[in-house]
């Protein structure tokens, strides 16, 4: 059986100029990055803004195993299948972060015969967007430290600077650092730290900005820290939003690539869903909606994280609301949520599938609270048995949710046709009545509690002393009308990664609340969620190499 990278490298790629002809593109609408990658020009983005949006489908998942459950694979395969049956379809997904690629994932461009290509480029440096975001973030850090060194006219309290540096790697050694050491000419010594690039507020800003002017306004609104009198200091006080936007002027343009079957795909932006809002850019999704009859997009991790944030944070910024939600389930993840140990997930266990179904059922119920119709996609693995699949089908029928087996990893577009037809039937016969979970005018505590009780099913929310102090500061500064972005483990509905399935009788503890005014939300930190991940004992990087002819090896 071929690996993902072997499949990807066996494909004869089409020139990207040919791929987008079906969308009505001219050569001048693209800024080429070689033969197979391009960015869309601002002129083309502007030209399609008056087009009526097509149908929007969000792909999400149940609580995953550490390897993930194949949301991107299903997203890509479903789009290929829709195109196969004559529906003009585009994809809008996130671009991978190099940290997890070198760490546990080994790649994040789909899998098998449902991939976006060229996968090696997408997984590595792509068009340089991640580096631009990293540079903009760290330029701001340098400008802050220079301001301190040059006399600190704004009266910034260096003990209360909340802006951190970033790097697009998993590097636990950089979580806490001290800068400015050595001598007075090296700046003002202070504690600092590094986050991973995809946790940067600038990543979230890039993914929520609708144009360059909106980008600049959002950058200007970033809070970098506080003065000695505890008043906030914004980027606009430093007057550097223009410089930061200049660094990002190419990165804000959506990237165009293709699937194995030639479906055009926007791959743009990549915030994590456990520490940020977990969705690709508004600009890419909005443009896809105006170019295609169907746009298939995804949100990170399980529906309790990525989908909730898509529906409560991203969707209000789009030209249309979702017409359907596809929840990806795997037999192995159901068994894990049913209590099976990781090393036994490949063994048949019908009873564990039944027990783990409570996790899927809760996600279905949660998505229905938004008024959007739901379809379940079973992402098929070769270890799944007929009895396990049959039980899952029956359980889905019992809660009246359409379900289809998708074998897109093994069979490409053909393996997604049943899912595509069921999705179309669901959309045509069940119009969406989308509504947000909560009103932004509720208090911070009420919004957090609404998410915790309605989505996670917590008994109550406990706000630690630091969080309570921060809420008072948020209210004082008039920031309390923003939506909430929960930072929580992806493995559980709770804030305990070991509490699997559909737990009840637990509390959610909020340890910190961080205003991200540029992004336009408040991050509520729970548990031990890290904004700078570490590498596993045996990182995927150990299996990576490059051949003498430049061919990438070991990505998967």
From Swiss-Prot:
Q: Which residues bind ATP?
A: 65-72
Which PROSITE patterns does the record match to this protein? FTHFS_1 (PS00721), FTHFS_2 (PS00722)
Concerning Pfam families, the annotation shows: FTHFS
In the Enzyme Commission scheme, what number(s) does this protein have? 6.3.4.3
Q: Which keywords are on file for this protein?
A: ATP-binding, Ligase, Nucleotide-binding, One-carbon metabolism
Keyword ATP-binding part of the UniProt annotation: yes
The GO terms describing molecular function are: ATP binding; formate-tetrahydrofolate ligase activity
- Name the chemical reaction catalysed here: (6S)-5,6,7,8-tetrahydrofolate + formate + ATP = (6R)-10-formyltetrahydrofolate + ADP + phosphate
* Pathway(s) where this gene product acts: One-carbon metabolism; tetrahydrofolate interconversion
Q: What's an example Gene Ontology biological process for this entry?
A: tetrahydrofolate interconversion
The answer to whether the entry has keyword NADP is no
The family assignment reads: Belongs to the formate--tetrahydrofolate ligase family.
Q: HAMAP family from the entry? A: FTHFS
* NCBIfam families, per database record: PRK13505.1
Could you tell me what this protein is called? Formate--tetrahydrofolate ligase
Origin organism of this chain? Streptococcus mutans serotype c (strain ATCC 700610 / UA159)
């Amino acid at each position: 059986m071929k690996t993902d990278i072997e499949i990807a490298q066996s494909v004869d790629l089409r020139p990207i100029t040919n791929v987008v002809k079906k969308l009505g593109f001219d050569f001048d609408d693209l800024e080429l990055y070689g033969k197979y990658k391009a960015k869309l020009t601002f002129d083309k983005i502007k030209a399609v803004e008056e087009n009526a949006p097509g149908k929007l489908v969000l792909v999400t998942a149940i609580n995953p195993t550490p390897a993930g459950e194949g949301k991107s694979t299903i997203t890509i395969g479903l789009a290929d299948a829709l195109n196969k049956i004559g529906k003009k379809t585009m994809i809008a997904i996130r671009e991978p972060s190099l940290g997890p690629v070198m760490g546990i994932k080994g790649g994040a461009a789909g899998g098998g015969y449902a991939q976006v290509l060229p996968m090696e480029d997408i997984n590595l440096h792509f068009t340089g967007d991640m580096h631009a975001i990293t540079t903009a973030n760290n330029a701001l850090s340098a400008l802050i430290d220079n301001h301190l060194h040059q006399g600190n006219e704004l009266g910034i309290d260096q003990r209360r600077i909340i802006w951190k540096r970033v790097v697009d790697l998993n590097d636990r050694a950089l979580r806490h650092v001290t800068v400015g050491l050595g001598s007075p000419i090296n700046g003002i010594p202070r504690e600092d730290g590094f986050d991973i690039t995809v946790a940067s507020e600038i990543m979230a800003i890039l993914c929520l900005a609708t144009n360059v002017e909106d980008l600049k306004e959002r950058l200007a609104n970033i809070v970098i820290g506080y003065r000695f009198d505890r008043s906030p200091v914004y980027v606009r006080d430093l007057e550097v939003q223009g410089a930061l936007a200049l660094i990002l002027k190419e990165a804000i343009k959506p990237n165009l690539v293709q699937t194995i079957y030639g479906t055009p795909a926007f791959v743009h932006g990549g915030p994590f869903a456990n520490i940020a809002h977990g969705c690709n850019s508004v600009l890419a999704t909005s443009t896809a909606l105006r170019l295609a009859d169907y746009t298939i997009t995804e949100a990170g991790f399980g529906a309790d994280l990525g989908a909730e944030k898509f529906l409560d944070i991203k969707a209000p910024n789009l030209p249309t609301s979702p017409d359907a939600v596809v929840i990806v389930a795997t037999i192995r993840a159901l068994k894990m949520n049913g209590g099976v140990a990781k090393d036994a997930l490949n063994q048949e266990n019908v009873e564990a599938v039944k027990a783990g179904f409570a996790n899927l059922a809760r996600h279905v119920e949660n998505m229905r609270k938004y008024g959007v119709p739901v379809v379940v996609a079973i992402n098929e693995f070769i270890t799944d048995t007929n009895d396990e699949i049959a039980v899952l089908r029956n359980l889905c029928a019992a809660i009246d949710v359409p379900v289809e087996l998708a074998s897109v990893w093994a069979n490409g577009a053909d393996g997604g046709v049943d899912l595509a037809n069921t999705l179309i039937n669901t959309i045509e016969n069940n119009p969406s009545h989308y509504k947000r979970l909560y009103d932004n005018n509720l208090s911070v505590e009420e919004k957090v509690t609404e998410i915790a009780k309605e989505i996670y099913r917590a008994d109550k929310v406990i706000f630690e002393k630091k969080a309570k102090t921060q809420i008072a500061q948020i209210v004082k500064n008039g920031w309390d009308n923003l939506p909430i972005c929960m930072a929580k483990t992806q493995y559980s509905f709770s804030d305990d990664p070991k509490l699997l399935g559909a737990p009840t009788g637990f509390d959610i503890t909020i340890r910190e609340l961080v205003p991200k005014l540029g992004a336009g939300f408040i991050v509520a930190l729970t548990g031990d969620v890290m904004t700078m991940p570490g590498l596993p004992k045996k990182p995927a990087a150990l299996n990576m190499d490059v051949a003498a002819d430049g061919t990438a090896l070991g990505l998967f």
